[in-house]
Amino acid sequence: MKRPPHHPVTVADVGGTHLRWARWSPDGGLGEVHTTPSPGHARRPGAGAADLQAELIRELASRVEPGARAGVSLGAAMDHHSGTAYASAPLWGPQVSPFDVPAALRAARPDVHWTVVNDVTAGLLHLAEMVRDAGVRKACLVTISTGIACRTMDLRTGGIPVDAAGLQGEIGHLPATVLADGVPVVTRCDCGEPGHVAASSSGPGIRRVAAVLARRDPATWAGSGPTTRMMAGSGFEDAFRAALDDGDPVAADLLTAVTAPIADLLRTALCLDPELDLIALTGGVAHGLEPHYSAAVHDHLRRRGLYLTSEREPDWLTGRIRVVPPATADPLVGAGLAALAAGPVPAYSGGGREALVGR
C-alpha cells in the first residue's frame, strides 16, 4: 500500500552565526532555504541572554504558518528529555541558565506543534537515514563550527544515549592542550573558561590561536600567507583557506596545531568503542577547510594512532573518519525527521534514550 504523503514541516536551524529555515517533507525534500544572521551573542555582544532568547523566539515564531508543524534544530547544550537549553556560548554568551525553549515557543505560537532538538542531534538523524543500509553499526557526527559537539547513535536500535542531565557529546568543553613549537597555546573558550577544545579548534578558537602565534613570532607572521591576504582585505577564514591552498607553511602549522585536539578526541573515541564504524565531521570549519582539514586530522592519527591496532591494521582508524558533505547531515532535514517522529507526543522518553521534544 502506498503511504500517504506528509504535509510539509517548517524547519529551522539555529546556529551561532546563521539562522536558516525552509519547508520540508520526506516526499518533496527541502524547499527554498532562507538565511539570516542568528540573533545571538556574536552579533549583539552587549545584549543580555534573556533579551537574545526572546528575540530568537520572536524570530522563530514569525516563520511558521498558522496551525503548522515545526521542527527546530538548536545550537545549544540541551536536556533532550525536556527540551530545556542549558547554555549556548555562541548564542547567549557565557551565562548558564536553563531556558525552556519548547514552552517559550508554545507561549508565542500555541497553534503550532513544536519539536526542538539539538542541532548535532538533528544532523545525526539525517546522517543515520543516509547510511542506514550501509552496514554501519554506530555513527558519530562531530560538528566543528562556531562551537564543537558530537552525537553518537546505535543504528541497530536508533538510540542516542544521554546522561543524567539529558546530555551527550559536549566535547567542545573538554580540556585540551594546544602546542606550537612545543609551547602551550592557551586561549579562552566562548563559555569563559580557558583550555577547552572549542577554545582552540572552533572557528573563533582558530582565530584566537592565530593571534597568539602572531604575537609570539611577529616577523614570521608578518610575511605569511594569511597576514598578507588579510592586509589586502580578505577576512581571516578566506585568507587562511587560500594560504592552505597555496601551501603556506605558517597556515599549515596553524592547522596542525588546531586539529590536534580533534584528533585526540577521535582516537580516544575509537579506542573506547570499536563499533563506531563512521565518524563524520561536519560544520563550517571542516567544510571550509576541506580537503586540508581531513588530511591534517588523518596525519595526526597516522603519526600517533592506536596501540597495536595502527601497526597491524594501518587504515582501520583513518578509514572510519571523514568529512561528509553538508547535504548528508543537514540539521534542517533532521529537524523535520524529528518533528514527524514526535507525533502528538515525544517518540522517545526516559530509559537513557534521547527524547525528541514535542510537548
From Swiss-Prot:
Keywords: Kinase, Transferase. Residues 28-48 are annotated as: Disordered. It holds the Pfam family ROK. Coiled coil: none annotated. It is an enzyme of class 2 (transferase). Belongs to the ROK (NagC/XylR) family. Catalyzes the conversion of 2-epi-5-epi-valiolone to 2-epi-5-epi-valiolone 7-phosphate. Involved in the biosynthesis of the acarviose moiety of the alpha-glucosidase inhibitor acarbose. This is 2-epi-5-epi-valiolone 7-kinase.
